[in-house]
Amino acid sequence: MDMISGSTAATSTPHNNQQAVMLSSPIIKEEARDPKQTRAMPQIGGSGERKPRPQLPEALKCPRCDSNNTKFCYYNNYSMSQPRYFCKACRRYWTHGGTLRNVPIGGGCRKNKHASRFVLGSHTSSSSSATYAPLSPSTNASSSNMSINKHMMMVPNMTMPTPTTMGLFPNVLPTLMPTGGGGGFDFTMDNQHRSLSFTPMSLPSQGPVPMLAAGGSEATPSFLEMLRGGIFHGSSSYNTSLTMSGGNNGMDKPFSLPSYGAMCTNGLSGSTTNDARQLVGPQQDNKAIMKSSNNNNGVSLLNLYWNKHNNNNNNNNNNNNNNNNKGQ
């Protein structure tokens, strides 16, 4: 029995001085039980009691706006001689018995400020997310289609001749394009059998093929040399002829093409000079034969003259006079 009582006494006695102080002080016990209450204690006055509100017969007037819609808020620095009031009309604070500060109207509410900032921040975030949101595949496809359509509108139509080209070449294009069955163009040399074929996109790929034949010399230049001007620069040994097969109503049209100066002065409108005449002959096997003479200083299909219109007229007049003198 004595040993049991001794053990219980040993367990009940504190092990050190700190535990004895904690058990003896009732304040520490209350703090251990309710820590929130102990944190709120410094907000009360130094004596541990809540200070009473000032008892006034009527509400104080606001020194700024003279409004009676005021209320007591708190004591400044826990001093009862400095009560702090708030005016609900102009939403400003002041201390009774103290000096007034230059405070703007409506600057005393913190809750509204925080709420407005939060609303503003959410609005800006939503707007930014809306602006930087990734595009859906449908919007990407529509935008790409719009860009492709814009580029296609800028590219000229290659299948149909534009009004400007038809205005520049009113008589050249109809003669080069077959009217009956259509078809491509094949420019072939007789001796070397070199051809340059191309098919216009606006014409079908069926029908007779026109021929460009050059004769009169054994050493025929190549087509590139012809383009550079080897055969079209007034050489009298070559006699070029364009044989073009028509479709249903072909006819012989021997004429000499106008000079470069005449084409420039007339704007390529199809008007010719005196020597560039167009004579319509009888039908011959449904073929339209266009021949160019050498009297015009080597006028040919690709009429690459670099002289002016007046110089060509003078040369033509001189040639006609020489022919008349020879005939006499």
Curated annotation (Swiss-Prot):
Keyword rRNA-binding listed: no
Superkingdom per UniProt: Eukaryota
An example molecular function term from Gene Ontology annotations: DNA-binding transcription factor activity
Region feature Disordered, mapped onto this chain: 33-56, 124-144, 306-328
A Pfam family this chain is assigned to: Zn_ribbon_Dof
One Gene Ontology term, aspect cellular component: nucleus
Record-linked PANTHER family: DOF ZINC FINGER PROTEIN DOF1.4-RELATED, DOF ZINC FINGER PROTEIN DOF5.7
Protein name per its UniProtKB record: Dof zinc finger protein PBF
Organism the protein comes from: Zea mays (Maize)
